[in-house]
């Protein structure tokens, strides 16, 4: 199996700095784009992830960077052959560890107090694919031309219903003073089929474009830069980051 991956992350039209970041294998992407093709064998592992630092917290750009770099190291250092349940347990242990680390950093350096970030990821480990989510960044699957959101937003809007195009308070994150962080993890191996496309994105995309618009762009073979540019043209009220993973 081969993965064709394209990622991009930009500040948008309103924010002063980009607090988003994308991780493709061992490469972090911010204010840039990056493409890679990865051949997977049974013994390989691969991680793509996206983090959206808390815009209302000092150090959001540090939070997203710290979490992705720490996860990249942790994932690469995991022992081979863990069962699905042991893999899930290891990720939960990592979540608790990184939360403690960010809390300690916030106490020792006041400028980072309550910094936090979302996280969404697609991982290949021990011949299985897993997606994971904490916050309101999203993972979608495009199958036979139809786009479906796999993750559930951990947000107030999702809890109470309704929508607001520009504001969506999250109810779960890594750091950010959240004492009860949790992470959704799903074994999605049976959903990973040749021709499918997986999309990781921050809310800077989904607040500017609806699912129908995103579906149309993906069916037109748009890359990560194209999706980011469309969000910026629509107003670019937030940082916008996209990672597209095509199953070849």
Predicted segment positions?
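PP2C/PPM-type serine/threonine phosphatase catalytic domain
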Residues: 1-248
């Amino acid at each position: 199996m081969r993965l064709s991956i394209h990622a991009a992350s930009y500040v948008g039209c309103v924010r002063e700095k980009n607090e988003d970041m994308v991780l493709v294998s061992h490469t972090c992407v911010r204010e840039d784009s990056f493409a890679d093709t990865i051949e997977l064998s049974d013994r390989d592992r691969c991680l793509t992830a996206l983090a959206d630092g808390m815009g209302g917290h000092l150090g959001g750009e540090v939070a997203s960077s710290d979490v992705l770099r720490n996860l990249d190291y942790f994932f690469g250092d995991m022992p081979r052959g863990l069962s699905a349940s042991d893999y899930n347990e290891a990720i939960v242990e990592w979540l608790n560890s990184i939360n403690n680390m960010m809390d300690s950093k916030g106490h020792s350096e006041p400028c980072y107090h309550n910094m936090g970030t979302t996280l969404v990821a697609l991982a290949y480990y021990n011949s299985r694919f897993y997606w994971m989510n904490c916050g309101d960044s999203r993972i979608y699957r495009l199958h036979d031309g139809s786009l479906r959101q796999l993750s559930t937003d951990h947000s107030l809007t999702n809890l109470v219903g309704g929508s607001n195009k520009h504001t969506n308070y999250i109810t779960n994150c890594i750091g950010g003073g959240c004492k009860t962080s949790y992470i959704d993890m799903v074994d999605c191996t049976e959903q990973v089929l040749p021709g499918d496309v997986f999309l990781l994105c921050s809310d800077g995309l989904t607040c500017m474009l609806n699912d129908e618009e995103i579906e149309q762009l993906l069916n037109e073979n748009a890359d990560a830069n194209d999706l980011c540019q469309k969000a910026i043209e629509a107003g670019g009220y937030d940082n916008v980051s996209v990672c597209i993973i095509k199953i070849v």
